[in-house]
Regions:
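The serine-hydrolase catalytic nucleophile loop
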Residues: 8-21
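Conserved alpha/beta-hydrolase
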Residues: 21-42
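Alpha/beta-hydrolase active-site loop
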Residues: 46-65
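Gly/Ala-rich beta-loop-alpha elbow adjacent to hydrolase catalytic centers
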Residues: 74-78, 82
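Hydrolase active-site cap/lid region
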Residues: 90-141
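Short beta-strand/loop motif that positions the catalytic acidic residue
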Residues: 156-157, 163-165
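Conserved alpha/beta-hydrolase "acid-adjacent" motif
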Residues: 170-176
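Catalytic histidine-centered segment of alpha/beta-hydrolase-like enzymes
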Residues: 196-206
Length: 220
């Protein structure tokens, strides 16, 4: 069973999320959902903080359906959520894949991330996000600041971990996946994908197939 965690401004009905789900169905059952504040889901996005509760609920539901083995596959924001979920919820998942995730919070080193921070932190940005991207963002800052992805990674072992990142990612350069891989040491794998951009939009069917095979091979 795969539980797919989409990126920021994604939703279960977005074409790129549906494509990911279709690709993974060749390897097992798939659960998709929209994080809080995204698409038709209620509430407001906390941009990766309380979203860990949403993923936990989806994984729990997958278990209740009778699936003994569950792997999470997260993209960008969803990738950071998958890392934190695996660190905080012991034995909740049997394999974790994080695609295009940041290593640390508050990164503004690229133009796309500076635009994203404008969407999140400015009132006018949140209006654009609501009506332009169907994503409703909570106005409050994080308090406390959640465990960062790079801090979460060492807590995931012995659960199998795969970190996937494109070397042409315009949001988070390759120092992010390398930091995550260093934190995982010999407990994780790193795939640096030549020419790949960011998150679901950039994940080819061939890559999704390899991810599906990896999860099946590790989670059983």
């Amino acid at each position: 069973m795969f539980v797919v965690a989409h990126g920021f401004t994604g939703a279960v009905d977005r074409p790129h999320v549906r494509r990911v789900a279709r690709a993974l169905t060749r390897y097992g059952a798939v659960v998709t959902f929209s994080f809080r504040g995204h698409g038709a889901s209620g509430g407001r996005s906390t941009v990766g903080d309380r979203e860990v509760l949403d993923l936990a609920a989806a994984v729990r539901w997958a278990r209740e359906l009778g699936h003994a083995r569950v792997g999470t596959v997260g993209f960008s924001m969803g990738g950071s959520v998958a890392l934190r979920h695996a660190a905080l919820y012991e034995e909740a998942t049997d394999a974790v894949v994080s695609v295009s995730a940041p290593a640390r919070w508050y990164y503004r080193g690229t133009a796309p991330m500076r635009r994203l921070h404008w969407l999140v932190t400015r009132p006018e940005g949140r209006v654009v996000s609501r009506y332009g991207f169907r994503t409703r963002i909570h106005h409050r800052d994080w308090d406390p600041v959640p465990l960062s992805p790079v801090e979460a990674v060492p807590k995931i072992a012995p659960t199998p971990l795969l970190i996937v990142h494109g070397d042409a990612d315009g949001y988070f350069p390759v120092d992010h996946p390398r930091m995550l891989a260093a934190a995982a040491a010999d407990q994780g794998e790193l795939w640096l994908e030549p020419g790949m951009g960011h998150a679901e939009h950039a994940a080819s069917d061939e890559l999704l197939g390899r991810i599906g095979e990896w999860v099946v091979g590790r989670a059983g």
